[in-house]
């Protein structure tokens, strides 16, 4: 289903046609959610279909960290022991993360030491550290993260567990999201309504320091400022972005069923390019 409301109505059918053509020729399942930061324009394609969240679930973890800091429950400069030991949500059994399956080396280099909550969040967002994410999830509490997701109205997003809980994965107990749910969270950050304007500005700055830029940013003109969070596992490739163009907007693209991540990245970049072109009119 595609919905396009308010603003730029004349471009809606053309944009729908172009995006749908890209999706139809991709061989994968794709969900798209677009909303201008001023709230006047919205485009939804299968935006309520559930996908594996992969590392995009780290966005609500970040929001909950800053919420607890605002509430005085913790301070961002608090130190947390770096210990590679986590507990499955299935039976409480202990498991460890494999550095070879992670995209970060900094947190592993600090094993047995401590790192600040702020630095762990930086690693979790900018290089998608699974180790940092699991440490933060255990510190913050998954129930608190879920409550914040619900409070912010991100229906369709569910955070159940940390990364590499294989017992949970084998039972289908996964973190999931919809394109609409992720869009809502990114929009809250963009507009200063996730936690507060100061905290949201710091979160947006972290998103702008993202290292993996081959999807939504690749479809934008060089130099365009974008804050985003990617997520990928086998046959899953997601990107959720705040694009700071002349008419700022939030764009989320979720892709399922494409084996080659270079192909899925190119698809997301193509959708991003079409959205930018429509927004520029």
Predicted regions and their residues:
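Short, conserved catalytic-motif segment at the N-terminal edge
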Residues: 21-51, 74
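Mid-domain, small-residue-enriched loop/turn segments at the edges of structured enzyme/sensor domains
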Residues: 29, 113-117, 121, 127-186, ...
